[in-house]
């Protein structure tokens, strides 16, 4: 799974059928299924189709009139695909846990973190395998400072706005279905984003314009 060979975000971008944007491309999906261990890709697609994924946006200025859902999608497009957002977007990626009474799962693709048990398991395994002389940063993060080696891949990329270096989390060491699912959604293409949020309406984008409700969201996650 070398970053020099494969640009995953470009493969994710081809997931929607070019001849019918209401369907996934079975060939690309089958190819990707073999590229990730533990049926990660299959579980990620199942998650995207489960109606258990939510994107909450702290919306201070949103106009409530008109088509609010489409406007929120435009906000995500500006933030993740066009880089034209005028201000830092505050958002949270949440997955509803299928176990009754379990807290919601918090996903952070910007820092490659997930609060699920699978992520914690592989993170601790990486810690145990780390030599005392090794820095955890070197074990889990691939740093590229040669511009000739820069990649256009956005999957598992940290701090994508840096112009001097590139950092990629070594996802082959730590990855879960939640991180992969949100990466497919937000690190691929506008077509893929709209496929799951608008066309199939399986991933929900919700605006919160009240700061108390926003803080309450975080309290519920912690609890």
UniProtKB/Swiss-Prot annotation:
Record family assignment: Belongs to the SHU2 family.
What is the originating organism of this protein?
Answer: Saccharomyces cerevisiae (strain FostersO)
The entry describes its oligomerization and partners as: Component of the SHU complex composed of at least CSM2, PSY3, SHU1 and SHU2.
GO-annotated cellular components:
nucleus
Outline what the protein does. Plays a role in a RAD51/RAD54-dependent homologous recombination repair (HRR) pathway to repair MMS-induced lesions during S-phase. Required for error-free repair of spontaneous and induced DNA lesions to protect the genome from mutation.
Q: Where in the cell is it found?
A: Nucleus
Q: Name the gene for this chain.
A: SHU2
Protein's name in the database: Suppressor of hydroxyurea sensitivity protein 2
Task: Cite the entry's keywords alphabetically.
Answer: DNA damage, DNA recombination, DNA repair, Nucleus
Which Gene Ontology biological process is one annotated for this entry? DNA recombination
Tell me where on the tree of life, at the top rank, the source sits. Answer: Eukaryota
């Amino acid at each position: 799974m070398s970053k020099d060979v494969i640009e995953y975000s470009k493969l994710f971008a081809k997931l929607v059928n070019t001849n019918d944007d209401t369907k996934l491309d079975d060939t690309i999906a089958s190819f990707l299924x073999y590229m990730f261990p533990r049926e990660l890709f299959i579980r990620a697609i199942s998650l995207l189709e489960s109606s258990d994924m939510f994107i909450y946006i702290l919306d201070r200025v949103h106009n409530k009139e008109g088509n609010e859902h489409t406007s929120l999608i435009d906000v995500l497009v500006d933030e993740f695909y066009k880089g034209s957002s005028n201000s830092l977007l505050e958002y949270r990626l949440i997955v509803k846990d299928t176990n009754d009474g379990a807290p919601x799962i918090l996903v952070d693709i910007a820092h490659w973190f997930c609060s699920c048990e699978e992520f914690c398991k592989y993170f601790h395994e990486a810690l145990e395998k780390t030599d005392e002389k090794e820095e955890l940063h070197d074990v889990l993060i691939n740093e590229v400072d040669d511009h000739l080696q820069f990649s256009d891949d956005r999957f598992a990329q940290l701090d994508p706005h840096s112009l001097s270096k590139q950092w990629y989390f070594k996802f082959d060491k730590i990855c879960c279905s939640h991180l992969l699912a949100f990466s497919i959604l937000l690190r691929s293409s506008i077509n893929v984003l709209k496929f799951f949020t608008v066309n199939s309406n399986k991933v929900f984008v919700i605006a919160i314009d009240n700061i108390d409700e926003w803080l309450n969201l975080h309290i519920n996650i912690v609890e």
